[in-house]
Amino acid sequence: MPKYRSHTTTHGRNMAGARALWRATGMTDDDFGKPIIAVVNSFTQFVPGHVHLRDLGKLVAEQIVASGGVAKEFNTIAVDDGIAMGHGGMLYSLPSRELIADSVEYMVNAHCADAMVCISNCDKITPGMLMASLRLNIPVIFVSGGPMEAGKTKLSDKIIKLDLIDAMIQGANPNVSDEESAQIERSACPTCGSCSGMFTANSMNCLNEALGLALPGNGSLLATHADRKQLFLDAGKYIVALTKRYYEQDDVSALPRNIANKAAFENAMILDIAMGGSTNTVLHLLAAAQEGEIDFSMTDIDRLSRKVPHLCKVAPSTQKYHMEDVHRAGGVIGILGELDRAGLLNRDVSNVLGLNLTQTLEAYDVMLTQDEGVKQMYAAGPAGIRTTKAFSQDCRYPSLDTDREEGCIRTREHAYSQDGGLAVLYGNIAADGCIVKTAGVDKDSLTFRGPAKVFESQDEAVEAILGGKVVAGDVVVIRYEGPKGGPGMQEMLYPTTYLKSMGLGKSCALLTDGRFSGGTSGLSIGHVSPEAASGGLIGLVQDGDFINIDIPNRGIVLDVSEAELAARRETEEAHGDAAWSPKGRERQVSYALRAYAMLATSADKGAVRDKSKLGG
């Protein structure tokens, strides 16, 4: 029988000092036999996805206490990728994921907590907490802050849905008036919550449902809706039961590595491909798998991407549907239901409720369930009122979207395409693979050949795009922006946004060893591995070299002879210590970022630390 970790600090005369300090936090004699559960919050006023979380940790903590546990809350950092975008702040975004994972480990191990409830929401916070959960392997339940309501505004006598990306595109479009740009900006992000499309934050919160570590509804139920409060209450209640299952019944199925096992990781990736999730999810799933010592790699993702259809199309791939519409159609469980009926899921998986996949679908799939309470939960909709408060409205749709032929979620037979929303490409320029969000690629661009326009940084590329130096047919190559070369693997949202604003969104391709925002669409290929700073072939591309992109056949090739590439490599390596570094780039890199770069792996490994350099 496993021993409660917390007994290390609460039992025995030699722990009198520790107990004295615990008493100073409000604990009493009766508490020293109870499980100590960490409430890992991420409240900050910097991030709209986290601005409403201040009191939600207390909500979870009170429920833990009522259920027989001891709750201890602490906070992690949280970076807003949208606010950090387009300047030096973006260098810190991905490295913050590692800091979040480490800080959770430090706090939980230093104080010997028995279990965790992770209150996350935005881009790097959910992955960082997920990495920590699988690293620590103690009982955990995730509950996120929830999605933002879609923005809405009236243009040309028509109400349209908006999000952050619309504000960015129109703000950079010289043909849009100042008045219209300001109207879109003021309407794009109306409430607290993670940005309203299938961007990185919402993608990851959906994947946590598929992994089994979050409660049904977690990925899609709006941050503003009163129904979301129940998820926080349930998380506080169920974590105590989950903790006792492990420590008092020796039930190892309660541990995250046994819930989020390889079969669950495959299901999560299948979901991601089917819903056209952010390419960043690939990076984060690979990183989490490494933390959990789960054998899940780019090879698995490539295999899955070839058989999974695109069943759910959401902004930024379409303006019609946002997360509130996904929820109305049945949310994550609704998509999983269609995937299961298509015979694509691993069924021998469980979740934090102790339910297997069949039981979960019977209870929560709107196409199967007889539970009116569940149907009411999925009818929870937006109020259209600007607010930063959680649970501030209780509006409901008059009916659910169960149209599986032309609705938000489709059956396999009526899929948006039989090819999924994400693809892994291989070729000489990406020997270890690269990622493209096919859900956002125009059908006419699935194959593309063009001359390279090479840039040593995102900033240089942006200047060229806005300066008219990039023309239709070009392949924009942005290198030395990978985990090591950036450092920090910046998101390339501004280059893709500006290509659209300059009318080049469907006539150019973009290739980078950096990554893309979940808000990116178009022929944008990222995560090129190995990256330039690690000697990847992308570092040898020259202006005018032709690059062939073939998404249907999963290929990407630099059309340059092996002899010429060998000569270029020899020339590059002759630079000695200056080899495989950007030429002429001026960038201030802090020592904190240099420390990250020293240990960072390329994107095909999840950009995690190279443990071999640490003796691991």
Curated annotation (Swiss-Prot):
Q: Does the keyword Lyase apply?
A: yes
User: Which keywords does this chain's UniProt record carry?
Assistant: 2Fe-2S, Amino-acid biosynthesis, Branched-chain amino acid biosynthesis, Iron, Iron-sulfur, Lyase, Magnesium, Metal-binding
The entry's free-text remark on the cofactor is: Binds 1 [2Fe-2S] cluster per subunit. This cluster acts as a Lewis acid cofactor.
The cofactor(s) it depends on are: [2Fe-2S] cluster; Mg(2+)
Q: In which pathway does it act?
A: Amino-acid biosynthesis; L-isoleucine biosynthesis; L-isoleucine from 2-oxobutanoate: step 3/4; Amino-acid biosynthesis; L-valine biosynthesis; L-valine from pyruvate: step 3/4
InterPro entries, sorted: Dihydro-acid_dehy_C, DihydroxyA_deHydtase, DiOHA_6PGluconate_deHydtase_CS, ILV_EDD_C, ILV_EDD_N, IlvD/EDD_N
Job description of the protein? Functions in the biosynthesis of branched-chain amino acids. Catalyzes the dehydration of (2R,3R)-2,3-dihydroxy-3-methylpentanoate (2,3-dihydroxy-3-methylvalerate) into 2-oxo-3-methylpentanoate (2-oxo-3-methylvalerate) and of (2R)-2,3-dihydroxy-3-methylbutanoate (2,3-dihydroxyisovalerate) into 2-oxo-3-methylbutanoate (2-oxoisovalerate), the penultimate precursor to L-isoleucine and L-valine, respectively.
What protein name is recorded for this chain?
Dihydroxy-acid dehydratase
| Species this chain originates from | Yersinia pseudotuberculosis serotype I (strain IP32953)
The upper taxonomy is: Bacteria, Pseudomonadati, Pseudomonadota, Gammaproteobacteria, Enterobacterales
